[in-house]
Amino acid sequence: MKNKNSGYKLSLNKLYNLKNQYYIYILASKRNGVLYIGVTSNLVKRIYEHKNNIIEGFSKKYHIHKLVYYETTNDIESAIRREKQLKKWNRKWKLEIIEKNNPEWKDLYFKLI
């Protein structure tokens, strides 16, 4: 649900990581646009921060707000390893993993909230 400040309202339970899961995610500015790869323990909260430009940096500068891919793991070390691995991939491989799992490049954030 969008509020009048162009942000998104979230219920409190969505803001906290209750399952002890970790997420590796890819954001895009648009289909085949600029990509951002990150890791977090709370995907809903983190994407909310990206969408509302709460986080200073690359994603804010290049308007990268669309969640197009994510993976889960129960181990922070493996999440960080996977994030580093994806960041080393060439662009073609990154686009292929998105296309394979989300061929329409839908914003997956709205399925999470």
Locate predicted features.
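GIY-YIG nuclease catalytic motif and its immediate N-terminal context
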Residues: M1-E56, K60-T72, E77-K84, I97, ...
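A common structural junction motif
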Residues: W89-N90
